[in-house]
Amino acid sequence: VNPGLVADPAPIKEMTYNEMRELSYAGFAVFHDEAILPAIQGKIPICVKNTNRPEMPGTKIVPRDKVSHKNKITGIASSHHFQAIYLHRYLINREVGFTAKILKIMADLNISYEHMPSGIDDLTIILDKNQLTNGRKEKLTQRIKDEIQPDDLQWRNDYAIIMVVGEGLVNRVGAMADIVDPIRDAGISLTMVNQGSSEISI
C-alpha cells in the first residue's frame, strides 16, 4: 500500500512476478516493464531495496514456483487518472460487430482502453484520461455519435481503480466479500468489479 495514503503499511517481504505486474498496472511504479523482462524470462529473483534504508531486507520478487508462501493479499495499489464513456442503445447485444466499430474508431485515434463492461443495451469504456488530450476526446465523441449513433452518450469523469493483488486469492471462498465490504462500509459505491482469469487480482 502507498505509505502516502496509509500510515505504516506492512512491508512486502516477497511477491511473484505476476503480482508485481498486476500491482504496477494500478500505480505500483517500481520497474519499467521492459527493464525486467530478461530477469522474468530467466527466472532470476530480484531484490528491491529502499535507497534511504539500505540496511532493510527489501522485497524479493520471484517466480511463482519459488514463492515461500502465498499471501491472501500481497499488496494494494490505486490510480485515479481514468474517465469513462457510457453508451446506451437498444439491443446492442444483438448487433454483430458493434464493439468492433468502436474499437476501430479508437484505434484510428490511437486510444487504447482499460476495461469495457457491457450490458444488454449499454456499454462503458474506461480509458486512461492521459490519452484524451489534444482534442482526442472531442474527436472520439463526435465519431461515435456520427458512426455508432447511440441513443445516449455520456462522459463520466474522475474514476479511480483500486487493485487488490495476491496469489492467495485464487479459489478462495469469500475473497470478493472481504474486499468489497470495507469499501461499502466507507460509503463508497462501486461502479465495476473485475477479477482476471488468473484470479490473483481484483
Q: Where would I find each of the regions flagged by the language model?
A:
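C-terminal catalytic "cap/lid" subdomain
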Residues: 1-202
